[in-house]
Amino acid sequence: MKIVSNWIWILLLLLFTTLFQACSFNKKMTVVSAASLLEEVAKSSYKQSELRVIQKGMPAYLMLMDGMVEAWPKNERLLIAAAQGYASYASAFIEDHDRIYARTLYGKAKDYALRSLARRGFERASERSFDDFEKGLTNLRKKDVPYLFWAAANWGSWIGLNLNSMEAMAQLPRVELMMRRVLELDERFYYGGPHLFMGIWYASRPKIGGGNLKLAQNHFKRAMELGEGKFLMAHVSYAYHYARRAFDKDL
């Protein structure tokens, strides 16, 4: 694993050198290329079966993204790549054994995602009045789905680790509206990710708080259908969040 880690650092160093040399030549092209590269690295990590490789490489990858965002703070593609990276690292490797650190990571992911959404024209998501918030969502279109999805998902994950905060809990209705808008625009996004989110949403809440196991099951099954077996997280979440509540030992 030491060799893998060293190679990652070498590749990142070469990338930084190339990018900043190119910056003086064509800054716009450099940003687009960097964003595309980060997105491809993120996609590749999801297909990597050796989790130790991902775990060793992610801190360097996150440092790279922070540096890129620092250099180009207004690029929404870089912002959303950073948001996705921090959320993935927190979910896969940190949350189960260090919830305090995971809360910090999700917070950073949330901030990056909301900044990317602001660049798409949906600003001050946590500050605007609820009516204005709801109205603003109707102006978003399918091309805005990646930004809206990751903003809602990361915001929801952050709230999930701040359940003792009334201020955080008060933001839940906004997250729900955001993900419902994603469902309206593109239910297939990220292997049926919006349905997976809503499945967890309904399964993890008590009935008095809006929980509904039947709706949860429907969303989980739709997510698995849209994922076509490529997104194992849907199956894992179905068993973990739904089966435990429904006492279905066959799942």
Model-derived regions: residue spans:
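Bacterial N-terminal signal peptides that target proteins for export
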Residues: M1-I10
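Sec-dependent N-terminal signal peptides of Gram-positive bacterial secreted proteins and lipoproteins
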Residues: L14-L15
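C-terminal motif of bacterial Sec signal peptides marking the signal peptidase cleavage site
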Residues: L19-A22
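N-terminal alpha-helical interaction modules that lie
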Residues: S24-G192, L226-G227, R244-L251
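Alpha-solenoid helical repeat scaffolds
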Residues: I80, G193-L196, L232-S237
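Hydrophobic face of amphipathic alpha-helices that form TPR/SEL1-like repeat modules
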Residues: W155-W158, F197-S204, H241-Y242
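Alpha-helical adaptor scaffolds
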Residues: E187-L215, K221
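Glycine/small-residue-rich hydrophobic helix-like segments
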Residues: G210-L251
